[in-house]
Curated annotation (Swiss-Prot):
This is 27 kDa hemolymph glycoprotein. Disulfide bonds: none annotated. The keyword Disulfide bond does not apply. GO terms for cellular component: extracellular region.
Length: 233
C-alpha cells in the first residue's frame, strides 16, 4: 500500500518537474492518471492542491541540492581527499529534506486511499532512517562509498543489477499473485534480491561498494515487517 502513495507522488512530480525527461504526451498522460486517481478517491477538486504540494517539494529539493553543482564539488574534492566536507555540508540539510518529504506525503493524501494512508507513519519513518543512514557521521558512509569507486562500481554493474531486478519481477506471476503472497515469502524475495545485488557488486575491484550496499539493504530490512516475520542474524 505504500507504493500507492509513491505512485501518486511520482505521477504528480512527473507532470511538474521539467528535469524529468518526458515527452509532452507522456506528461499529459501522467496528468490524466493523477486526475483519475483523485477522482477515484472523490477528490477531483484536489488535483491542483496535490500538484501544488509536489511543486513545493520539487522547489524544496532544488533548494537543498543542485545535481550539477554537487557533481562538480565531488569531482573537485575527490582528488584532494575532501569528500567528507562536501557531504557534511549537504547532510546538514537533512532535517529540511525530512520536512519536505513529510509535507509531500501530506500533500498527496487527498488522492490516496485509507489503507495507504495508514502506512504513512512507517513510510515516513523508513525514509527518515534512510536519510540518517546515508548521513551517518555527517555523511561518512556516502563519502567512503564515492571515494572507493562506488559510482563507477554501480555503473559497471548496471546490466547485472538490471538482471537482478528482472528476476525479481519475473518471480511474481501476476500482480494478484504478488498481493496474495505471504509476508515470509515476500521477505524471501527481498532477501534473494539482496543476495543477487551484492553478488553483482562484489565483482568490482574494491569491496566497499558491495559491503555498503549490503549494509543499506540490511538496514531497510531491519526496519520492515520482515524483521519480525523472518528474523535474520
Amino acid at each position: 500500500m505504500i507504493w500507492k502513495t509513491l505512485i501518486v507522488a511520482f505521477m504528480a512530480t512527473a507532470v511538474l518537474a521539467q528535469e524529468i525527461d518526458l515527452s509532452d504526451q507522456r506528461r499529459e498522460q501522467y496528468r490524466n492518471m493523477l486526475a483519475a486517481q483523485c477522482r477515484k478517491m472523490g477528490a477531483e477538486d484536489k488535483v491542483k492542491d496535490v500538484e501544488s504540494s509536489v511543486r513545493n517539494f520539487v522547489e524544496c529539493l532544488r533548494g537543498i541540492v543542485d545535481p550539477q553543482a554537487i557533481k562538480k564539488e565531488i569531482e573537485e574534492a575527490k582528488p584532494k581527499g575532501e569528500l567528507d566536507e562536501v557531504f557534511k555540508k549537504y547532510c546538514a540539510k537533512a532535517p529540511v529534506l525530512k520536512t519536505c518529504i513529510s509535507s509531500l506525503l501530506d500533500g498527496v493524501r487527498p488522492c490516496v486511499d485509507k489503507v495507504a494512508i495508514d502506512h504513512y507513519g512507517p513510510l515516513l519513518n523508513t525514509t527518515n532512517q534512510l536519510i540518517d543512514f546515508v548521513c551517518y557521521k555527517d555523511g561518512e558512509r556516502i563519502a567512503l562509498f564515492i571515494a572507493h569507486g562506488g559510482s563507477e562500481c554501480f555503473k559497471n554493474s548496471t546490466e547485472d543489477l538490471k538482471k537482478c531486478a528482472e528476476e525479481m519481477k519475473n518471480s511474481f506471476p501476476s500482480v494478484e499473485a504478488a498481493k496474495a503472497m505471504s509476508l515470509p515469502d515476500k521477505c524471501g524475495k527481498f532477501d534473494d534480491l539482496t543476495t543477487c545485488m551484492v553478488t553483482s557488486l562484489e565483482k568490482c575491484e574494491n569491496p566497499t561498494p558491495a559491503n555498503m550496499a549490503e549494509s543499506l539493504l540490511k538496514f531497510i530490512r531491519k526496519d520492515s515487517p520482515c524483521n519480525a516475520a523472518v528474523p535474520k542474524d
